[in-house]
């Protein structure tokens, strides 16, 4: 038991040190981890019809703190957990929150540390409710985000 937790922690450390995202997106990784309570609602095979209060609270915190991190969470990929992107896009509406549309993620630079003049990149002023789900099923694997989720689940035995 302790061996598994130690091995998982060591693996996480090694992968995070070698990750190209470590320096620019570590703040986002920390924020995205708080969305674990949303997995039953946004993951493929998730059984929740509505997000929990804890999920909505975490989403609100990210939107208030660094909304670009939601894009980072969707852009990162490989390890296991797959998100239903269509359902993920409805999360802000389900939580009764305003958020930039998912389509805005493509036009944004990756999250990064403050620029040379000391200012962080700005998200933009295009705030609007997330779009309603369309017919069909948009599914993509989400990896970096997935790795963090899988590791946390293993460590906390959720």
UniProtKB/Swiss-Prot annotation:
InterPro entries: Bifun_inhib/LTP/seed_sf, Bifunc_inhib/LTP/seed_store, LTSS, Plant_nsLTP. Residues 135-158 form a propeptide. A lipid is attached at residue 134 (GPI-anchor amidated serine). GO terms for molecular function: lipid binding. Keywords: Cell membrane, Disulfide bond, Glycoprotein, GPI-anchor, Lipoprotein, Membrane, Secreted, Signal. One of its GO terms (cellular component) is extracellular region. Probable lipid transfer protein. Belongs to the plant LTP family. This is Non-specific lipid transfer protein GPI-anchored 29. The lineage of its organism: Eukaryota, Viridiplantae, Streptophyta, Embryophyta, Tracheophyta. The gene is LTPG29.
């Amino acid at each position: 038991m302790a061996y598994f937790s130690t091995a998982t922690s060591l693996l996480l450390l090694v992968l995070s040190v070698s990750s190209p995202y470590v320096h620019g997106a570590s703040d986002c990784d920390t924020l995205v981890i708080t969305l674990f309570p949303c997995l039953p609602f946004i993951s493929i095979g998730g059984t929740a019809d509505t997000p929990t209060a804890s999920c909505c609270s975490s989403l609100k915190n990210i939107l208030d703190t660094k909304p670009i991190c939601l894009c980072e969470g969707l852009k990162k990929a490989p390890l296991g957990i797959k998100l239903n992107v269509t359902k993920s896009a409805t999360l802000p509406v389900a939580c009764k929150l305003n958020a930039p549309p998912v389509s805005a993620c493509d036009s944004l630079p990756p999250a990064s540390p403050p620029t040379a003049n000391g200012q962080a990149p700005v998200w933009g002023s295009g705030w609007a409710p997330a779009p309603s789900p369309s017919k069909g099923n948009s599914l993509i694997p989400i990896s970096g985000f997935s790795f963090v989720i899988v590791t946390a689940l293993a460590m906390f035995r959720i």
